[in-house]
Amino acid sequence: MSKNKDQRTAKTLERTWDTLNHLLFISSCLYKLNLKSVAQITLSILAMIISTSLIIAAIIFIASANHRVTSTTTIIQDATNQIKNTTPTYLTQNPQLGISPSNPSEITSLITTILDPTTPGVKLTLQSTTVRIKNTTTTQAQPNKSTTKQRQNKPPSKPNNDFHFEVFNFVPCSICSNNPTCWAICKRIPNKKPGKRTTTKPTKKPTLKTTKKDPKPQTTKSEEVPTTKLTEEPTINTTKTNIITTPLTSNTARNPELTSQMETFHSTSSEGNPSPSQVSITSEYPPQPSSPPNTPR
């Protein structure tokens, strides 16, 4: 009955609140118009009354809300008192829990486990309950623990018959019967057993960084060999001539041609030393004057 009364009062308060708001709006609009002084005074009085009634309605509304809160707290307290006053009988009757009826003071708390079937894992929630035995109450609050089992994602199992569905990019030799061109093109298929395929990854060779150095030209200084220049000595050309000795007679003095022939036979050496025959000849006869050389003009 108390709940119904609270609901009715709340509805009436809401209705009065709305009507008072509308009246305030209408009175403010009328006050803005140029009316007589008496009408303006009455409108202002109405506005004051409406505003005070709104304040009163708000106070009542807040009080009713507080009353609702207190009523819910009293209901909760009544429920807890009923739980405290009534002791559970199945605790003393269940031998699996290890509790005998002779010592009921050992009963302190009841832990219930609730399994949630909607979640993939299992959630264990520990709830604390209070039990009153011989005017003694003990409470144990334990945090709620949630444990979830992680699903192991298994890889999809591959069928073992993959070997039978291989697509060949070449002509197998089993097809060729007596065709020579087919035997020239075909390739023999090795006998493979279905199993694990081993894939060999190409190993990358380490790149060796080589720095090329410019070869410097090796300059070898050629040792100068001291060369000794041989002083050329003048070669003396000695021409041996058959000297025909002719007796100097009186005819030689008479004939000057004979004297010239004699001078040619007795030739001098390269050093210009006259022969003794020439000296003797020239000594006997005076030298003839030689003709002067032809000088160009």
UniProtKB/Swiss-Prot annotation:
Any GO BP annotation: virion attachment to host cell
Cellular compartments per GO CC: extracellular region; host cell plasma membrane; membrane; virion membrane
Positions with biased composition (Pro residues): 286-297
Gene it is expressed from: G
Region (Disordered): 133-161, 191-297
Residue numbers spanned by region Binding to host heparan sulfate: 187-198
Biased composition (Basic and acidic residues): 211-232
A Pfam family hit: Glycoprotein_G
Composition skew (Basic residues), residue ranges: 191-207
Chain ranges on the Cytoplasmic side, renumbered to this chain: 1-37
Keywords: Disulfide bond, Glycoprotein, Host cell membrane, Host membrane, Host-virus interaction, Membrane, Secreted, Transmembrane, Transmembrane helix, Viral attachment to host cell, Viral immunoevasion, Virion, Virus entry into host cell
Stretches that traverse the bilayer: 38-66
Organism: Human respiratory syncytial virus A (strain rsb642)
Extracellular topological domain: 67-297
Biased composition range(s): Low complexity: 233-249
Iron-sulfur in keyword set: no
Site keyed Cleavage: positions: A65, N66
Designated name of the protein: Major surface glycoprotein G
Residues carrying sugar: 70, 72, 80, 86-87, 92, 100, 105, 113, 119, 135, 137-139, 144, 147, 199, 203, 219, 231, 235, 237, 251, 269-270, 275, 282-283, 290
Biased composition range(s): Polar residues: 133-155, 250-282
Sequence similarity: Belongs to the pneumoviruses glycoprotein G family.
Record-annotated disulphide pairs: C173-C186, C176-C182
